[in-house]
From Swiss-Prot, chain B:
GO molecular function terms listed in the Swiss-Prot or TrEMBL record: protein-transporting ATPase activity
Subunit annotation: Forms a complex with SecF. Part of the essential Sec protein translocation apparatus which comprises SecA, SecYEG and auxiliary proteins SecDF. Other proteins may also be involved.
Membrane topology: Multi-pass membrane protein
Protein origin, superkingdom: Bacteria
Protein name: Protein translocase subunit SecD
GO biological process, alphabetically ordered: intracellular protein transmembrane transport; protein targeting; protein transport; protein transport by the Sec complex
């Protein structure tokens, strides 16, 4: 028999569980004090985006800032791709205000490859946010029911705590780093919740199978063996998924980058949490029952 | 299921044939983020005496659709969102400002007498078109329906010498004096119009007034060059990603990996064909979802093959380990994929625009990959593993 790695030893798993909890607590502290950096889709405001063929110099950027601030004093100018992309963010501008702002801006930015203007009123954003929360809650309930039916109730609870951890950990990372949260972020979060539960269920399936095969064996040993047995598959899938999306991160353009970044995080968090959240909780639970 | 391998093979070949045919004949429908255009969200405004009911919103959408049809936009999409919002998406439009003016204007036309009493509204009109007077000044000729014509004839015969006020959205656009009774049910609206203004007015009058006024609360103008650039680079990145996955599978699982790669290729063909068949709108996050699904599709194979390796260590024949590998891995694959599809369904139900597109591509990808990576891989392997070559050369199988 191949040598097994002891993932779920009592001390190791408790250290990791406490560290995970600490991370989420710090993340939530940031979430409640600093909040998330919502993209314009979640808040009211106007953004004018330009893609340029040659980068702007600092003089031009200062000019743009002055122009935008003459409309709204807290406007910001953000550049990307070495100055070849510009975002001008202001408060919500009415049609006629936008019609005055853009010609002024285009006195500075004379030539551009592409332009995108987005304006959103606050009512929309509230609805979007509420829908996102509702979708997350519903997804969790549906998974809880499905796993209880297919496995056992304690499996379902561990899996849901695992999902909650993945969600909170991702939000923590975005709260601490202040990366922008856009609508595709919601799609990404739901995908990575799917990825995490996928990974989780593959391991739980092995635990279910091994528990039937060796009903007398200590549960923690069974769980640890199951993780070891599925380790090869876990590794392969992490690699193939990363291979598929990494080119997109490199060459896929700015628009998709936050989405792919969130998927990356999800793969790492999901793989980790299957072991140190889902399986670890299940072990604690079973040891308590003894 | 005990279906003979030949029948399964024939079934797969037929499906693949249909998919390739669809792929070659049907076009892709790209979302606004790729094609460019405008996306406007309108909110219906409550006014005196008019409540925002479902019916009012529906009729408003109808009028907006009529107006857009006259603009000649290809594949516009107009739909209700929430209780009182209307989303209008116009792909590939050249003059977004003009379109916005035409969509958003209430265009309530009223004929009023000198006391300000309304005699007729725009709903009494049958047609409106642009004409020119002797000096080439544009004007709009309106044609009334029979009841309208009768009311107007009555009114004009009683009020010769008085003024009639033609009011659009509360603003007087002309106030001619009635010289003689107008009985034939046509009239002209003159004003100091430019040709463009006259054309716009004619469109608005033909399509009718909005039952409730609307306000633009979200307005996105997306330049087509941006989306096209991203699409092209995403396409290239997707191809590179797929090649990397294919190579990895061969490297790790040898011949088994190659078979999984063939199934993966079939998966991509089926997936794209299904998207075309469903006329799904392909957005940028949707494209990312397709690429992601290529990486995740082979997960089933990794599970099965990893299991086959384990089983082979105990059973020693490729066929027996194939059977046990599939049988044992299937449970885990189904349980994990069903949960993913459930999550995707919730996304679809609550999501909007691009997110819905993403949910469609995700769940379609999971369902199809289960078919290709399990059924097709198995059928191929059942046919191939009985070949004499594999009796001894198990190294080739990567077991």
């Amino acid at each position: 028999m191949k040598k097994e790695i002891n993932f779920l030893g009592k001390r190791v798993r408790r250290v990791f569980m406490i560290l995970s909890l600490l991370f989420v607590i710090i993340g939530m502290y940031f979430f409640f004090t600093k909040g998330l950096n919502y993209s314009i889709d979640f808040q009211s405001g106007s953004v004018i985006y330009y893609k340029l063929s040659s980068p702007l110099n600092s003089n031009q950027i200062a000019n743009l800032r002055d122009i935008a601030r003459s409309f709204y004093s807290k406007s910001t100018i953000q550049t990307g791709s070495n100055g070849k992309e510009v975002w001008i963010r202001t408060k919500f501008l009415e049609e006629n205000e936008l019609k005055r702002l853009t010609p002024e801006v285009e006195k500075v930015i004379v030539k551009y490859e592409g332009r995108e203007i987005t304006t959103i009123e606050p009512t929309i954003s509230r609805e979007l946010r509420e829908k996102a929360i509702l979708a997350a809650v519903l997804a969790i309930i549906v998974m809880l029911v499905y796993i209880t039916v297919r496995f056992r109730f304690d499996f379902a609870i561990s899996a849901i705590i695992n999902e909650a951890f993945v969600l909170l950990a991702t939000i923590s990372i975005f709260a601490i780093s202040q990366w922008e949260v856009s609508p595709s972020f919601i799609a990404a979060i739901l995908t990575l919740l799917g990825y995490a539960i996928n990974d989780n269920i593959i391991v739980f399936d092995r635990i279910r199978e091994n528990s039937k095969k060796y009903p007398k064996e200590d549960f923690t040993i069974i769980a640890n063996r199951s993780i070891n047995q599925t380790l090869a598959r876990t590794l392969y899938t992490v690699i193939t998924t990363l291979l598929a999306i990494t080119p997109l991160l490199i060459w896929g353009g700015v628009v998709l980058r936050p989405f792919i970044l969130a998927i990356y995080l999800g793969i790492i968090i999901g793989t980790y949490s299957t072991i140190y959240i889902a399986s670890a909780i299940l072990c604690e639970w079973r040891e308590l029952q003894k | 299921m005990n279906i003979r391998p030949e029948i399964k093979t024939a079934f797969i070949v037929i499906i693949l044939g249909i998919a390739i045919w669809i792929l070659l004949t049907f076009p892709f429908r790209y979302g606004l983020d790729i094609r460019g255009g405008i996306r406007v969200t309108l909110q219906c405004q409550k006014t005196e005496g008019v409540e925002i009911t479902d019916d009012a919103v529906r009729r408003t959408i109808e009028v907006i659709r009529n107006r857009i049809d006259q603009l000649g936009v290809t594949e516009p999409s107009i739909y209700k969102e929430g209780s009182d919002k209307i989303v209008v998406e116009l792909p590939g439009i050249k003059d977004p400002e003009r379109a916005l003016e035409i969509i958003g204007q209430t265009a309530l036309l009223e004929f009023k007498d000198e006391t300000g009493k309304t005699i007729l509204t725009g709903s009494a009109l049958k047609n409106a078109k642009v004409e020119f007077d002797q000096v080439g000044q544009p004007m709009v000729r309106v044609e009334m329906n029979p009841e309208g014509a009768k009311i107007f004839a009555d009114f004009t015969s009683k009020n010769v010498g008085k003024q009639v006020f033609i009011v659009l959205d509360g603003k007087v656009i002309s106030n001619p004096v009635i010289k003689e009774p107008i009985t034939e049910g046509t009239g002209v609206i003159t004003g100091r119009f430019t040709i463009d203004e006259a054309q716009k007015l004619a469109i608005l009058l033909r399509a009718g007034a909005l039952p409730v006024p609307v306000k633009v609360i979200e307005n996105r103008t997306i330049d087509p060059t941006l989306g096209k650039d991203t699409m092209e680079s995403a396409y290239r990145a997707g191809v590179i990603g797929a090649i990397l996955v294919v190579l990895f599978m061969i490297l790790v699982f040898r011949f088994l990996g190659l078979v999984a790669d063939i199934a993966l290729l079939i998966y991509v063909v089926l997936d794209l064909a299904a998207l075309k068949l469903l006329n799904a709108t392909l957005t940028l996050p949707g494209v990312a979802g397709i690429i992601l699904s290529i990486g995740m599709a082979v997960d089933a194979n990794c599970l099965i093959f990893a299991r086959m390796k384990e089983e082979y260590a105990q059973r020693k024949t490729p066929m027996a380990s194939l059977d046990a590998g599939f049988r044992n891995a299937l449970r885990a694959i189904i349980d994990s994929n069903v949960t993913t599809i459930l999550a995707a369904l919730i996304l679809f139900y609550f999501g909007t625009g691009p997110i819905r597109g993403f949910a469609v591509t995700l769940s379609l990808g999971v369902a199809l990959s289960m078919f290709t990576q399990i059924t097709i891989t198995r059928t191929l392997l059942e046919n191939l593993l009985s070949l004499p070559v594999f009796k001894k050369a198990t190294k080739l199988l990567g077991l």
